[in-house]
Amino acid sequence: MTSKEIRQQYLKFFESKGHLIVPSAPIVLKDDPTLMFNNSGMAQFKEYFLGNGTPKSPRIADTQKCLRVSGKHNDLEDVGFDTYHHTMFEMLGNWSFGDYFKKEAINWAWELLTEVYKIPKQNLYVSVFEGSKEDNVPFDQEAWDIWKGLIDEDRIILGNKKDNFWEMGDQGPCGPCSEIHVDLRTPEEKAQVSGKSLVNNDHPQVVEIWNNVFMEFNRKADGSLEKLPAQHVDTGMGFERLCMALQGKTSNYDTDVFTPLIEKVTQITGYKYTSNEVKNISEEQNKTNIAIRVIVDHVRAVAFAIADGQLPSNTGAGYVIRRILRRAIRYGFTFLDTKEPFITKLVAVLASQMGEFFPEIKSQQQLVTNVIREEEASFLRTLEQGLQLLDKVVAETKGKEVSGAKAFELYDTFGFPIDLTALILREKGYELDEAGFNAAMQEQKNRSRAASEVFTEDWSVLIPGNIETFVGYDKTENDVKITRIRKVNSKKDGILYQIVLDNTPFYPEGGGQVGDKGTLVSANDSSDSEQAKQTIDIIDTKKENNLILHFAKQLPENIETGFVAKVNTNLRASTSKNHSATHLMHLALRSILGTHVEQKGSLVNPDYLRFDFSHFSKVSDDQLRQVEASVNAQIEAQLQLTEHRNIPIKEALDKGAMALFGEKYGDNVRMIEFGESKELCGGIHVKNTAQIWHFKILSEGAVAAGIRRIEAITGDAVKAFYTNQENTLSEIKEVLKKPQDILKSVTSLQDDNVKLKKQIEQLLKEKIEGLKNTLVSEFQEINGINFLSKQVDLSMSSTKDLLQALGSLKPNSFVVLASIEENMPNIHCYIAKELVAGKGLNANVVIKELGKYIEGNGGGQPFFASGKGKNVSGIKEALQKAIEFVK
């Protein structure tokens, strides 16, 4: 049975049980501050478990793209070393939201595995929760009794809280779970050791394939449990492990989920991969196998993340994606001898293999290919640079142990992998101070953790069961009541309060648009005095699990009274102009550059707009002028907003509306039209494009391979921009004595500047030549070394030129020169290569020592190094100390 057939059978089975089949949510989460990525099948349904929304159906099933790089068995650095853990994986899942419970979930799981997939019953073990005195949760007798009717009692295992009580996080819905494990060992192996003893013990052929979670409780901030108002079922089955079991393999990587990718890697690199059936392989072959597993696993995670809108970067989720990709690159570099980008060539295989079920990987194939290629090329350059830096560290090392702090600097600053550092050091006969490296790493983690720690209290619910209504499309002010509040304490923001209202005109951050700001004003009817009314500033608005959260630094004195919610209309007006202009610009870009242009990210705030889009070359100045002119023409056309607030998504798409990849849409959507511009969008817009007034592009540049970014302004910001330009032009005219032709005057100045620069360069050359001829007579011969140390009156750059010239005049030369530029001392050392090789002298070491006297630092190569400092008075002593290196 192929993996495609296995996936289809799962969905078909649960469709026959009355489940609505829904598509996978994007792997990148955009509206859940507690998660960067979809790490489980249930992540997209959290709002239903929390009671903040109503699902399309009480029964749902899907296959969800998931990504994990931390947690139980999911440390990134371990992936590839075993045969059944992954960064990106598919989670087959079926859910019940207050509908069926344990009986149906367990019976259907058993029916599918044993009757449809025909896994032998004697190969299966199940576990149930043994109970917890700590949480006052009893043994799961109900699940035990159901399983007893399906499987021999000696195949039912009692599991502890770690393995058989599933929790969403530190807080939130949770409950006991019942796992199903499969034993894939040979009959001989089973006869020797019981599979029961290997369950949950990291045996590669006795693995969990399905977990049925019975959501009954809510974990509160104080750690206690309370009953949920309804019981839910949340199940997850690892697709790759299921394929391993059904295809008769003992490794996920030997299934047809991975073999096409593995075959492509072996074809590109020439290195062979051996299946898990081959035993007693060499250590070298094992390293090759691990490297190939790492690469084929990681390319899936990276490709799907990019396709869903997450580009590699240096922060947040983007950093995680970059880290995964770089791990794959370094395994290829180290163990498969790949010095050119090659992982990018796997994208076509992945798109062909999975594009039918996940069309985004097919439609975004070119973008994914280009981004990975650029990331590979960049990191391969970093690896080459890191090798040079590591050579420098080794040269400075006294003894045979390299500083862990230095290795961490290579890792942290330059991205040079620590395992590669350790490997190279061993080859050179050195050891790595691992304790020092780990200490530096832990210190950084502690700093990061302390900076990002957030303590969230439980909700205090004032009005139970209320579903918040957003009225912000029609109103900027409305009467409201507070329905719930909670306190959040973080290192970054201090104490904040999250307030939920029964209805709100405040737009929550989403779709690239920032959240509204404004005020809550108490509606105190008992007093006509405005001073008696309390005003609370709302500093931000966000959405979490279908709740609109209003952030404030304080709570009202009386939270049970009525309030008037007032949006800051000035900020909203500016934001709406920028948002509508973004739509007009998107249309213009597609018209001028081509329909390949797709939105890849945006930021819309009151000050400016930022728009990231797919395009594979720089946008020319002429094209930018065309885009600007097109947008301004649409503004001048005074296009009226046409809003379809609750239109079926199919109808909207049929009308030509653009949907954005990586966005999660419901059955009904909001569609925004300005003339030919039609987009699915939930944001705030102007009523007529004339309100935008004017559109001005400020900059255009690259964000990543195949991704460009435009920043632009509208409305009052354009007026301020032109006023500033006018003032600057007036100042320039004043400086130039108010010439009639300002352009001609500036051009004349530029020509004069070029001539003067040439004259200065000639004078400097003559000065350097004169100093060279003077100083050549001041060399001293000491122990067969031609030594010179001197302070000169030159710029730092010219001092280096003179140093090189003097060094080449005599054999065995050792020259130290110093100078002062802008009241800052600089010092430089040249050592002839024959002295570096023959006497072990090192200019880098010299500069580090002499730099102490000028309160500075520096470095370079063994034959040439430079440094800068702060203490001018230390130059004399530094030059005097230089001679000690040759005595």
From Swiss-Prot:
The keyword Ligase applies. It is found in: Cytoplasm. Signal peptide: none annotated. InterPro entries: aa-tRNA-synth_II/BPL/LPL, Ala-tRNA-lgiase_IIc, Ala-tRNA-ligase_IIc_anticod-bd, Ala-tRNA-synth_IIc_core, Ala-tRNA-synth_IIc_N, Ala-tRNA_ligase, Ala_tRNA_ligase_euk/bac, DHHA1_dom. Its cofactor is Zn(2+). One of its GO terms (cellular component) is cytoplasm. One of its GO terms (biological process) is alanyl-tRNA aminoacylation. It catalyses: tRNA(Ala) + L-alanine + ATP = L-alanyl-tRNA(Ala) + AMP + diphosphate. Its EC number is 6.1.1.7. Keywords: Aminoacyl-tRNA synthetase, ATP-binding, Cytoplasm, Ligase, Metal-binding, Nucleotide-binding, Protein biosynthesis, RNA-binding, tRNA-binding, Zinc. Binds 1 zinc ion per subunit. Pfam families: DHHA1, tRNA-synt_2c, tRNA_SAD. It is an enzyme of class 6 (ligase). Belongs to the class-II aminoacyl-tRNA synthetase family. Consists of three domains; the N-terminal catalytic domain, the editing domain and the C-terminal C-Ala domain. The editing domain removes incorrectly charged amino acids, while the C-Ala domain, along with tRNA(Ala), serves as a bridge to cooperatively bring together the editing and aminoacylation centers thus stimulating deacylation of misacylated tRNAs. Catalyzes the attachment of alanine to tRNA(Ala) in a two-step reaction: alanine is first activated by ATP to form Ala-AMP and then transferred to the acceptor end of tRNA(Ala). Also edits incorrectly charged Ser-tRNA(Ala) and Gly-tRNA(Ala) via its editing domain. This is Alanine--tRNA ligase. It comes from Flavobacterium psychrophilum (strain ATCC 49511 / DSM 21280 / CIP 103535 / JIP02/86).
